[in-house]
């Protein structure tokens, strides 16, 4: 199952692990070493010539004692967000995931009502699911932790692995049934479809305004420039919800909707 997962099949570790500021999450062995040394992603200086993917040894203490204890997770300690001092994710076994699935940066502050966007990647970086669960890291709007953070024991692990410890890490519908009895899909009461429609509307407005561009390969880039704060926030929040978090509200439906609703107001 692991081989079919994105962690198991992606070659991103080859592309990114050679950079010291990327190796924590993109090199499985660097992650293990960094966790053992109690280093956060921004403190890592390890660069391996032969990087490894996020394999068994990245998450588990394989071949340490040669006993059943080797299946123990590398860490389940609560995670302090290095880009957001004072913010902590404490989601049980899901804490392991949050070490990497956290924002690397925050939206730029406005100066005289304008935000200077200087990067084509104006977003929190890939995989900030833990901050979405907490209801934070959006531009111009803070939220609250979702029920999927506060009520689901072991957060990420419960929903993405289920009782069978599914190592594809694809969300397991069976994990939802304790609260959402008899559902047959993740789009409960059409909530995800409604949010998707608003995300699509916002995307069209951002393209029309020239704040993002279509790269023609299924990806989009931010267009650098000096923008009114509300529009820059809209650019950030669209990317955060639609491109980086990717759950279409499943991680925090209330916060995701609030971010997109506020963004749409920037384009009357």
What are these regions (language model features)?
Residues 2, 96, 179, 263:
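Divalent metal-coordination and catalytic microenvironments
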């Amino acid at each position: 199952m692991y081989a079919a997962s994105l962690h198991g099949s992606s070659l991103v570790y080859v592309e990114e692990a050679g950079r010291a500021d990327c190796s924590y999450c993109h090199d499985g062995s660097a992650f293990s070493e960094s966790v053992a040394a109690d280093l956060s992603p921004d403190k890592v200086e390890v660069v391996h010539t032969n990087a490894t993917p996020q394999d068994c040894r990245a998450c588990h203490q394989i071949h340490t004692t040669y006993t059943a204890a080797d299946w123990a997770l590398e860490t389940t300690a609560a995670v302090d967000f290095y880009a957001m001092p004072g913010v902590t994710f404490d989601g049980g076994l899901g804490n392991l995931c949050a070490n990497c699935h956290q924002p690397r940066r925050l939206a730029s502050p406005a100066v005289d009502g304008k935000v200077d966007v200087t990067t084509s990647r104006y977003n929190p970086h890939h995989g900030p699911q833990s901050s979405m669960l907490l209801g934070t890291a959006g531009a111009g709007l803070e939220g609250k932790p979702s029920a999927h953070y506060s009520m689901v024991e072991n957060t990420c692990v419960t929903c993405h692995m289920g009782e069978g410890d599914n190592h594809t890490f694809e969300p397991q519908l069976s994990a939802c049934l304790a609260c959402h009895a008899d559902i047959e899909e993740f789009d409960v009461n059409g909530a995800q479809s409604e949010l998707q429609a608003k995300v699509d509307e916002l995307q069209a407005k951002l393209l029309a305004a020239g704040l993002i561009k279509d790269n023609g390969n299924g990806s989009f880039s931010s267009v650098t420039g000096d923008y009114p704060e509300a529009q820059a926030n809209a650019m950030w929040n669209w990317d955060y919800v639609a491109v980086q978090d990717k759950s279409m509200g499943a991680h925090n439906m209330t916060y995701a909707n609030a971010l997109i609703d506020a963004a749409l107001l920037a384009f009357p």
